[in-house]
Every structure is written in structure tokens, then in C-alpha cells.
Amino acid sequence: MAQASDSTAMEVEEATNQTVKKRFEVKKWSAVALWAWDIQVDNCAICRNHIMDLCIECQANQAAGLKDECTVAWGNCNHAFHFHCISRWLKTRQVCPLDNREWEFQKYGH
């Protein structure tokens, strides 16, 4: 069996000694990839900022360097909010701002 580099242009020799023309030859390949967060929530419903951006409280205190502390809090209802936003909300009401179910933390952090 001949190697592809030994074959003449557009021909390959198979094990049965038959000559078969290639359908096509890849000259150059540029791969493209796409990724996205696996979440259904894009924005915090309280401050309306993107959920992966800083909340309004952290934006106001950006000079203090607290941006690593701006995390996402998920409820058992699968709604997500900035932790600072939902913490302020929970001081007055113990329910989810979107569906009025009793708020319980499902997970906390990015």
C-alpha cells in the first residue's frame, strides 16, 4: 500500500491494487469554535445587569476592588440573581422576585 505522499496527484492506491480517485483534498483547514454559559438566565432581574457582569452595588464600589466578590446566587426555582441583589431583596421579602415562591438557595457562586 503506498503512502499518500507517494501517490500521484488525486490518486490513492488501495490494498486491492485498484486505483481510486480522491473525492477532494483538504488544502487548508481553519477550525472555528463557539462556547456559551450553560444557563437560561442572562440578566439579573433585580438590577438588570448581565448575570456574569458586576451588579450595581459592585459597579459603584469598583474602586474598592471587590469585583471578585460579585457572585451569582441560584434559587431552588432555578432563577439566578447577583448575590448582593438577592441579599438586599431578602431583607424585606423571603420570596423569589420572579415567581413569589419561598426563596431557598440552591447554589452560590459562579
From Swiss-Prot:
Gene Ontology terms, MF aspect: cullin family protein binding; ubiquitin protein ligase activity; zinc ion binding
Keyword tags: Cell cycle, Cell division, Cytoplasm, Developmental protein, Meiosis, Metal-binding, Mitosis, Nucleus, Ubl conjugation pathway, Zinc, Zinc-finger
GO biological process: anterior/posterior axis specification, embryo; cell division; male sex determination; negative regulation of DNA damage response, signal transduction by p53 class mediator; negative regulation of intrinsic apoptotic signaling pathway in response to DNA damage; positive regulation of metaphase/anaphase transition of meiotic cell cycle; programmed cell death involved in cell development; protein ubiquitination
Chain residues that bind Zn(2+) 2: C55, C58, C70, H84
Domain of life of the organism encoding this protein: Eukaryota
Alphabetical list of InterPro entries matching this protein: RING-box_E3_Ubiquitin_Ligase (IPR051031), Znf_RING (IPR001841), Znf_RING/FYVE/PHD (IPR013083), Znf_RING_H2 (IPR024766)
Metabolic or biological pathway, per its Swiss-Prot or TrEMBL entry: Protein modification; protein ubiquitination
Residues binding Zn(2+) 3: C77, H79, C96, D99
SUPFAM superfamilies: RING/U-box
CC terms in the record's Gene Ontology section: Cul2-RING ubiquitin ligase complex; cullin-RING ubiquitin ligase complex; cytoplasm; nucleus
Residue positions binding Zn(2+) 1: C44, C47, H82
Zinc finger (RING-type): 44-100
Tissues in which the protein is found: Strongly expressed in the gonads of hermaphrodite animals.
CDD domains given in the database record: mRING-H2-C3H2C2D_RBX1 (cd16485)
Location(s), subcellular: Cytoplasm; Nucleus
PANTHER family per the UniProt record, alphabetical: RING BOX (PTHR11210)
Domain description: The RING-type zinc finger domain is essential for ubiquitin ligase activity. It coordinates an additional third zinc ion.
Family: Belongs to the RING-box family.
Subunit structure: Part of SCF complexes, which consist of a SKP1 or a SKP1-related protein, a cullin protein, and a F-box protein. Interacts with csn-1 and csn-6.
Protein's job: Component of the SCF (SKP1-CUL1-F-box protein) E3 ubiquitin ligase complex, which mediates the ubiquitination and subsequent proteasomal degradation of target proteins. Through the RING-type zinc finger, seems to recruit the E2 ubiquitination enzyme to the complex and brings it into close proximity to the substrate. Essential for meiosis, mitotic chromosomal condensation and cytokinesis. Involved in histone H3 phosphorylation.
Protein name: RING-box protein 1
Organism of provenance: Caenorhabditis elegans
Gene giving rise to this polypeptide: rbx-1
